């Protein structure tokens, strides 16, 4: 009888240790060679995790424009900025996920986010008229506006631009992870995981053609990226704090990606890098250890640093509209600044974006129904710091040529980018990149609602 009691107590202790809920605590353990007293642990290992996530995202922001024509502005004060447009985007995404244990806390992961629908539009901001919009005055949009879903009819109300409805796949995410520490194996230690994830761009690249606005409904950036991450989790009775840190960097692009290197004096042409931290504390509201039923509340946050680089902004489709080389728009580029005349090429739409910080408040309710089924319902509130979204440099001022030097230098000794030389950045457009003409994204606010279901074996 004492032996049976001890065995039962050990079983309950092991079950309680494995009754985790948040993702930082789950380790698909894979196959272990165990025997004797460790056989129960082998049977309780999490080897396969299948999940399906659904997210609805709603984002808004205000587009401001710098002005160098305000005669009433204080010449010693800050550069005047004026309201111009309001932005709204809605997106629905479903993501199937799979994590498979390989051997002794080493696991493989895969995910395939599928954008079901994405819609976005720009409207006149408070107090702005169609004729008074600086975007209209600069010739980027007609005063009547443009509706990509019905190009022959101007948009109604205060809508200035409505983009095409988009859907599809951006990247497939393939990863490998390892847990140097696992609380399931040793309850005196936290769960510590390390991982790397390769994000391969496989979907249709997101582009905009004013002559055929409905021809491209893609959502992919056409950029292959690498994500490195680590996470820590520690269950302490009825509370479970956790944290995850990550860094994501572009590696290469597909042949039709907009993130191409044009040469000459172009700098910062790659997609923006990001790095962030996500954290939370899961609090048990109901924990039935015997039947493996549990309800918990997870309160946390997230901070993501977006580093300077090129990316899709709120205005990217408008910029592509105004930079179509088949027309006469103000954003048409010169692909070869050294040749005489203009070698017209279309503005891709993506632009250089200033560093900014994204912060998120997170709340989730998690439920475990037995040892194999889990559900999560969550809501996020997202803020982004104000930042400039047209930020391309005019080029690179090369050093003066030394004795016998003929390349990567200039013959004149000055501190400016000389027009008509290799110093010029072909992606720079004074009409939106020069100080006094730049666009700003401000008052960013977003809401994310999500539901997730997991099956664990």
Name each region found by the language model.
Residues 1-32, 416-426, 457:
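Cleavable N-terminal export/targeting peptides
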Residues 22-23, 35-48, 105, 121, ...:
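Short loop/turn motifs that connect adjacent beta-strands in outer-membrane beta-barrel proteins
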Residues 24-26, 54-93, 123, 209, ...:
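Surface-exposed strand-loop-strand hairpins of Gram-negative outer-membrane beta-barrel proteins
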Residues 48-58, 110-114, 192-200, 243-249, ...:
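Transmembrane beta-barrel strands of outer-membrane/channel proteins
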Residues 54, 96-102, 110, 174-180, ...:
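Residues on the lipid-exposed face of transmembrane beta-strands in outer-membrane beta-barrel proteins
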Residues 56-64, 116-122, 182-184, 200-208, ...:
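Gram-negative outer-membrane beta-barrel proteins
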Residues 69-70, 253-457:
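Outer membrane beta-barrel transmembrane domains
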Residues 117-270, 400-413, 418, 423-437, ...:
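Outer-membrane pore/translocation modules
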């Amino acid at each position: 009888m004492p032996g049976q009691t001890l065995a039962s107590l050990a079983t309950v202790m092991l079950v309680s240790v494995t009754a985790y809920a948040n993702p930082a605590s789950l380790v698909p353990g894979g196959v272990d060679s165990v025997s004797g007293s460790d056989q129960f642990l082998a049977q309780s290992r999490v080897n396969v995790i299948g999940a399906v996530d659904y997210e609805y995202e709603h984002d808004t922001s205000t587009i401001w424009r710098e002005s160098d024509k305000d005669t009433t502005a204080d010449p010693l004060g800050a550069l005047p900025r004026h309201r111009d447009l309001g932005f709204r985007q809605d997106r629905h995404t479903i993501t199937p996920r799979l994590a498979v244990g390989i051997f002794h806390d080493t696991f493989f992961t895969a995910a395939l986010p599928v954008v079901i629908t994405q819609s976005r539009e720009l409207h006149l901001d408070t107090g702005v008229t169609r004729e008074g919009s600086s975007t209209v005055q600069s010739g980027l949009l007609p005063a009547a506006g443009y509706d990509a879903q019905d190009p022959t009819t101007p948009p109604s109300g205060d809508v200035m631009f409505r983009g095409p409805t988009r859907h599809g796949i951006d990247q497939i995410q393939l990863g490998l992870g390892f847990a140097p520490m696992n609380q399931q194996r040793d309850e005196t230690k936290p769960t510590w995981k390390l991982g790397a994830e390769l994000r391969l761009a496989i979907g249709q690249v997101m582009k905009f053609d004013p002559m055929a606005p409905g021809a491209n409904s893609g959502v992919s950036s056409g950029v292959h990226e690498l994500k490195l991450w680590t996470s820590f989790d520690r269950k302490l009775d009825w509370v479970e704090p956790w944290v995850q840190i990550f860094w994501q960097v572009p590696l290469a692009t597909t042949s039709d990606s907009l993130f191409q290197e044009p040469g000459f004096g172009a700098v910062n042409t790659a997609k923006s890098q990001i790095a962030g931290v996500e954290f939370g504390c899961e609090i048990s509201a109901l924990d039935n250890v015997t039947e493996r039923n549990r309800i918990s509340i997870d309160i946390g946050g997230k901070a993501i640093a977006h580093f300077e680089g090129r990316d899709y902004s709120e205005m990217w489709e408008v910029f592509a509209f105004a930079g179509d080389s088949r027309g006469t728009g103000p954003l048409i580029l010169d692909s070869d600044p050294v040749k005489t005349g203009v070698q017209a090429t279309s503005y891709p739409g993506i632009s250089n974006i200033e560093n900014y910080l994204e912060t998120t408040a997170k709340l989730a309710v998690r439920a475990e129904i037995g040892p194999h089924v889990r559900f999560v319902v969550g809501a996020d509130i997202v803020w982004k710091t104000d930042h400039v979204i047209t930020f391309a440099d005019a080029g690179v001022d090369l050093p003066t040529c030394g004795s016998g030097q003929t390349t990567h230098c200039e013959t004149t000794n000055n501190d400016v980018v000389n027009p008509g030389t290799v110093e010029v950045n072909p992606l720079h457009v004074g009409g939106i990149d020069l100080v006094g003409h730049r666009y700003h994204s401000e008052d960013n606010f977003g809401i994310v609602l999500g539901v997730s279901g997991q099956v664990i074996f």
